[in-house]
Swiss-Prot record:
The keyword Transport does not apply. Its cofactor is FMNH2. This is Chorismate synthase. The keyword Zinc does not apply. Keywords: Amino-acid biosynthesis, Aromatic amino acid biosynthesis, FAD, Flavoprotein, FMN, Lyase, NADP. Belongs to the chorismate synthase family. It comes from Bacteroides fragilis (strain YCH46). It is an enzyme of class 4 (lyase). The gene is aroC. Gene3D superfamilies: Chorismate synthase AroC.
């Protein structure tokens, strides 16, 4: 049951990093939506490994194959099944991990919980599982387009290098013009240089992604335990390496007084809006029609190419030096994953909202 995400729109994923493939089944997708398979593939390409010198060198085509739920280019309302075959596994790179635990990975917790683990690339705990999320998110984006809802994420911080402005201060069309996926070209160059330097040291680094949802209607969210920001937080923190989530002004708002933090209402030609958006587009757990924006912090990748202390499966102290192909920073490839999780959450809550009133 915990391999599924969503309520009405529901993604169930399967597969491991070094297994035969990664796939999923989507239930609750509305019928009659035009399925642009080229767009879905483009989204996968944004997540795909081997994009640049600051990502893992693993080469995978990551071509999605739809198995059901689509007829003559449109969704039928039936379950949509899909799979992406793994083609470039180097499982021998992980032979030295069979009997030792990698620091800050899921190796130890998986072993204790299940009594068995797939040591090849982390198995089910690998970020390769997010392929299914990106496919599900791409389909959700296609449905949300028809509702005028658009979702954009970008890198806003790598280590100590960060954007000081809000998302409104940047041209978001510049995000895809650099490998870091940052809308500020100068900061993007600094971030890229830092990641490349860290990679050369055999180390890794983390940072922050910012996500903006535009066009979200008023009323999405289910009080008390189904608040929209709680659902978005759950979605984001389910992503590998995600460590923190804040929406609106978040922790920065703690420096303000209530009179400064409040978003006052006004009548904008018959439409009630707020003069500011400290709330991040959500009040009382329900969308208020303003832009929804939030940030997700990602830790440095746990696999570093230097010797570390650890223990083996018998609890004996030893050392470990990782091998294989790994990202020095997850942020560039996490951008489409954050967008995907946001898209699936918003579509799910949109469908839930249709049940509120007859």
């Amino acid at each position: 049951m915990f391999n599924s995400f969503g309520n009405i729109f529901r993604l169930t994923s399967f597969g491991e990093s070094h297994g035969k493939g990664i796939g999923g089944v989507i239930d609750g997708f509305p019928a009659g939506i035009v399925i642009d398979e080229e767009f879905v593939q483009q989204e996968l390409n944004r997540r795909r490994p081997g994009q640049s010198v600051i990502t893992t060198s693993r080469k995978e085509a990551d071509k999605v194959e739809f198995l059901s739920g689509i007829f003559e280019g449109k969704s039928t309302g039936c379950p949509i099944g899909f799979i992406v075959w793994n083609e470039n596994q180097h499982s021998n790179d992980y032979n030295n991990l069979e009997k030792v635990y990698r620091p800050s990975h899921a190796d130890y917790t998986y072993t204790v919980k299940y009594g068995i683990r797939d040591h090849r690339g982390g198995g089910r705990s690998s970020a390769r599982e997010t392929i299914s999320r990106v496919v599900g998110g791409a389909l959700a984006k296609l449905a949300l387009r028809q509702l005028g809802i658009h979702i954009t994420a970008y890198t806003s911080q790598v280590g100590p290098i960060k954007l000081e402005g809000n998302y409104t201060d940047y041209d978001l069309d510049l995000i895809e013009t650099n490998p870091v996926r940052c809308p500020d070209p100068e900061k993007a160059k600094e971030m890229q240089d830092l990641i490349y330097k860290i990679k050369g040291e055999g180390d890794t680094i983390g940072g922050v992604l910012t996500c903006v949802i535009k066009g979200c209607p008023i009323g999405l969210g289910q009080p008390v335990y189904g608040k929209l920001h709680a659902a978005l937080g759950n979605a984001m923190l389910s992503i590998n390496a995600a460590k923190a989530f804040e929406y609106g002004d978040g922790f920065k708002g703690l420096k303000q007084k209530g009179s400064e933090q409040n978003d006052v209402f006004y009548n904008n030609n018959g439409r009630i809006e707020t003069r500011t958006n400290h709330s991040g587009g959500i009040q009382g757990g329900i969308s208020n029609g303003q832009d929804i924006f939030f940030r997700v912090a990602f830790k440095p990748v746990a696999t570093v190419l230097m010797e570390q202390e650890t223990v083996n499966i018998d609890g004996i102290d030893t050392t470990l030096k990782a091998r294989g192909r790994h990202d020095p920073c997850v942020l560039p490839r996490a951008v489409p994953i954050v967008e995907a999780m946001a898209a699936m959450t918003i579509l799910d809550y949109y469908l839930l909202d249709r049940m509120t009133q007859l």
